[in-house]
């Protein structure tokens, strides 16, 4: 094992995770150009005509910049969140609304359709998708206004409908979701996707504009009725769904298209693998425990802490030195007035109760660099943190109950700061155990 401070090791592994999810780097790693061929993850595409780019999501500009740097781009559009825009050589940049779509979201989609209309059968169209694309890139179906679409989404959000149910309805009142964008590609579509969805379900990322969709107009109506909002949504939405049920409006994409190829180029899983590789290079055994971690943050922290305790005290299920990696997205349920913090800060703080006095470190962070509504990416704690908190008179149980993890961790140097990373592949927890208790 390389002689390094445990905190230094933790920070290095965080860096590897973020590097693996960097949009610019991810595109360059995935796409190679050789003579008159484009090679993506081993699949070859012949360059016979022009190259166009349509990028949508928070990482749109960085992904588009990478394509511009390796190919001669004829034209393109990048639709991203306000404040995320960067000037590109040939590609037009449009900043739009997120998480609520606005007129610029529609403008971005119209620009994209204009490009698809110009692209011929021998051309290549790159579609670059990242988190936030669902709101940033929108074009309601005929007869449905942006306000109607926003009201429908708002009613669904307030009804308690699950995210996949909300997306089912949205796909059936949008011209670009549920594989409908793919239907408009006449040439070769090369789709590069950065996943911000736990489990990497491509249908769920930006509401799946380029992948087949199993849901139907029947499902959309059933969901609106189930949550008792069928009569509350705008008449234009009801009429469109009724037309779909009668077969007068085309369904979402039901079969993969032979000319459209989807590639996952960055995800929580890919970042977790990068951590494991670097940990092994540093002399640790490394295990990816899950990439679908969900549930209440403080419970996840206690559970991860208890695994670390078992390893450090009994050498099971793994002997130290070892690195465990957990990917996913946990939540914080706030009742009453919450304090300052985020799910990853709660994971770290909660884990301190289990790893006190152990040769161990836990770092929990959001890969976008922002954990909850704070300037911290997450929390970083070790075997000394719990004692330091007690010495400062901080009651961990009370702080967790009040959801005030930021202030508690701040007092003991337990906050992790990365700054905005320009990417998002959800959250990651890294647990490092260097030796068993009583051993150095």
From Swiss-Prot:
Report the EC number(s), separated by commas if there are several.
Answer: 2.7.1.165
Catalysis performed (reactions): (R)-glycerate + ATP = (2R)-2-phosphoglycerate + ADP + H(+)
Q: Which GO terms describe its molecular function?
A: ATP binding; glycerate 2-kinase activity; glycerate kinase activity
Q: Name one GO cellular component term.
A: cytoplasm
How pH affects activity? Optimum pH is 7.0 and half of the maximum activity remains at pH 6-10.
- Coiled coil spans: none
UniProt xrefs under InterPro entries: GK-like_C_sf, GK_N_sf, MOFRL, MOFRL_assoc_dom, MOFRL_protein
Signal peptide residues are: none
Q: Where does substrate bind?
A: 58
The temperature profile of activity is: Optimum temperature is 45 degrees Celsius. It has strong activity at moderate temperature 30-50 degrees Celsius and about half of the maximal activity is retained at 100 degrees Celsius.
The record ties this protein, via Pfam families, to: DUF4147, MOFRL
| CC cofactor | Mg(2+); Ni(2+); Mn(2+); Co(2+)
**Which keywords are on file for this protein?**
ATP-binding, Kinase, Nucleotide-binding, Transferase
Q: How does it assemble?
A: Homodimer.
Protein role: Catalyzes the ATP-dependent phosphorylation of D-glycerate to 2-phosphoglycerate. It can also utilize GTP, CTP, UTP, ADP or pyrophosphate as phosphate donor.
In the record, the note on similarity to other proteins reads: Belongs to the glycerate kinase type-1 family.
- What name goes with this protein? Glycerate 2-kinase
């Amino acid at each position: 094992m390389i002689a390094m401070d445990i905190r230094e090791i933790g920070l290095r592994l965080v860096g590897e995770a973020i590097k693996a999810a960097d949009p610019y780097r991810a595109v360059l790693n995935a796409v190679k150009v050789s003579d008159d061929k484009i090679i993506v993850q081993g699949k070859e595409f012949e360059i016979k005509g022009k190259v166009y780019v349509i990028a949508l999501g928070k990482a749109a500009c960085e992904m588009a910049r990478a394509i511009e740097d390796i190919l001669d781009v004829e034209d393109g559009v990048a639709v991203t969140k306000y404040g995320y825009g960067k000037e590109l050589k040939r590609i037009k940049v449009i900043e739009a609304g997120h998480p609520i779509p606005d007129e610029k979201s529609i403008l971005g989609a119209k620009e994209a359709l204009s490009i698809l209309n110009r692209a011929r059968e021998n051309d290549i169209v790159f579609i670059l998708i990242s988190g936030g694309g669902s709101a940033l890139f929108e074009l309601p179906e005929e007869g449905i206004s942006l306000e109607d679409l926003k009201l429908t989404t708002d009613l669904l959000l307030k009804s308690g409908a699950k995210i996949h149910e909300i997306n089912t309805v949205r796909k059936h009142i949008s011209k670009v979701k549920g594989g409908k964008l793919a239907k408009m590609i006449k040439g070769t579509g090369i789709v590069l996707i950065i996943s911000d969805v736990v489990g990497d379900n491509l249908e769920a990322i930006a509401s799946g504009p380029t992948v087949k969709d199993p849901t139907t107009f029947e499902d959309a109506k059933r969901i609106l009725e189930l949550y008792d909002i069928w009569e509350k949504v705008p008449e234009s939405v009801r009429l469109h769904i009724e037309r779909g049920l009668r077969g007068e409006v085309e369904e979402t994409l039901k079969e993969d298209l032979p000319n459209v190829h989807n590639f996952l180029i960055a995800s929580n899983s890919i970042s977790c693998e990068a951590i494991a590789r670097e940990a092994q290079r540093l002399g640790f055994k490394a295990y990816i425990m899950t990439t679908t971690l969900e549930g209440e943050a403080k419970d996840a922290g206690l559970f991860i802490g208890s695994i670390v305790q078992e390893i450090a005290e009994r050498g099971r299920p793994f002997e130290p030195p070892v690195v465990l990696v957990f990917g996913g997205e946990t939540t914080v349920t706030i009742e009453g007035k919450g304090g300052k913090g985020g799910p990853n800060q709660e994971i770290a703080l909660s884990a301190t109760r289990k790893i006190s006095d152990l040769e161990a470190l836990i770092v929990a962070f959001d890969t976008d660099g922002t954990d909850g509504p704070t300037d911290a990416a997450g929390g970083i704690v070790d075997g000394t943190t719990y004692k330091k908190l007690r010495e400062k008179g901080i009651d961990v149980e009370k702080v967790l109950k009040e959801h005030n993890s930021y202030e508690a961790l701040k007092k003991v140097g337990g906050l992790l700061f990365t700054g905005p990373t320009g990417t998002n592949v959800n959250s990651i927890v890294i647990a490092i155990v260097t030796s068993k208790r009583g051993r150095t």
